[in-house]
């Protein structure tokens, strides 16, 4: 049974970072765009200096940012992945990859045309995050999409040879339903928060349910 990778996104304080670093997450995400979870490279650099990164990887999330803006952040922080969460084109992703020499993931917002959109990034995107489409917001909404569509996204990502994370409205209460579809990764922000702060108890619930699922090895067809 393949592992399910966990990404805890939207870390926005020293406490959030310490909690996430102590967790079982594989990736820590930071939002470098207009958002209630927006952070600056300077803040993140300071928080990371207070603790050991260990084997966790860092993801920087950007929305329609210029390559210069992205490169400015990657030069200041030891990011492993750049996540483009807006309307960036395949050509723009290629430029970001060339400039940063990092893995670049593309967010795909679920709708009837999303699968065709995903196919356009084949050979360019190093991974995908499929998120809910919510008017006026790019992500971190706490809203999930119809997970019956998940297998189609996973199949396309597998065809391209890259991982596919699922995001949007995932909580300790519903993660088992999502795990049944065998996603490559799960991207959580609001679902691991209490009163706007990362909650280690919710993280532990997420991790325990994921481990239980992997141990049993069950999944939807």
Curated annotation (Swiss-Prot):
Q: Which InterPro entries match?
A: Aldolase_TIM (IPR013785), PRAI_dom (IPR001240), RibuloseP-bd_barrel (IPR011060), TrpF_fam (IPR044643)
Q: Which Pfam families match?
A: PRAI
GO MF annotation terms: phosphoribosylanthranilate isomerase activity
- Top EC group: isomerase
Q: Which domain of life is it from?
A: Bacteria
Q: In which pathway does it act?
A: Amino-acid biosynthesis; L-tryptophan biosynthesis; L-tryptophan from chorismate: step 3/5
A single GO BP term for this record reads: L-tryptophan biosynthetic process
* EC numbers for this chain: 5.3.1.24
Q: Does the keyword Disulfide bond apply?
A: no
Q: Does the keyword Isomerase apply?
A: yes
Q: Which UniProt keywords apply?
A: Amino-acid biosynthesis, Aromatic amino acid biosynthesis, Isomerase, Tryptophan biosynthesis
Q: Which reaction does it catalyse?
A: N-(5-phospho-beta-D-ribosyl)anthranilate = 1-(2-carboxyphenylamino)-1-deoxy-D-ribulose 5-phosphate
Family indicated by similarity: Belongs to the TrpF family.
Q: What is this protein called?
A: N-(5'-phosphoribosyl)anthranilate isomerase
Q: What is this protein's gene name? A: trpF
């Amino acid at each position: 049974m393949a592992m399910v990778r966990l990404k805890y996104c939207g870390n926005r304080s020293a406490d959030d970072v310490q909690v996430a670093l102590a967790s079982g997450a594989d990736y820590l995400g930071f939002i470098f765009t207009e958002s209630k979870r927006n952070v600056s490279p300077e803040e993140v650099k300071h928080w990371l200096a207070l603790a050991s990164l260990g084997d966790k990887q860092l993801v920087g999330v950007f929305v329609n940012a210029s390559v210069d803006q992205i490169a400015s952040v990657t030069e200041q922080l030891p990011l492993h992945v750049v996540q483009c969460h807006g309307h960036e084109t395949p050509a723009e992703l290629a430029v970001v990859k060339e400039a940063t020499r990092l893995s670049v993931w593309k967010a795909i917002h679920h709708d009837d045309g999303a699968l065709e959109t995903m196919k356009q990034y084949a050979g360019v995107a190093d991974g995908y995050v499929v998120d809910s489409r919510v008017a006026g917001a790019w992500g971190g909404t706490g809203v999930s999409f119809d997970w019956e569509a998940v297998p189609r996204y996973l199949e396309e990502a597998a065809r391209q040879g890259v991982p596919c994370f699922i995001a949007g409205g995932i909580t300790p209460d519903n993660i088992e339903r999502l795990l049944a579809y065998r996603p490559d990764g799960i991207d959580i922000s609001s679902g691991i928060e209490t009163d706007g702060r990362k909650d280690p108890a919710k993280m532990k619930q997420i991790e325990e349910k994921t481990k239980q699922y992997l141990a049993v090895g069950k999944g939807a067809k």
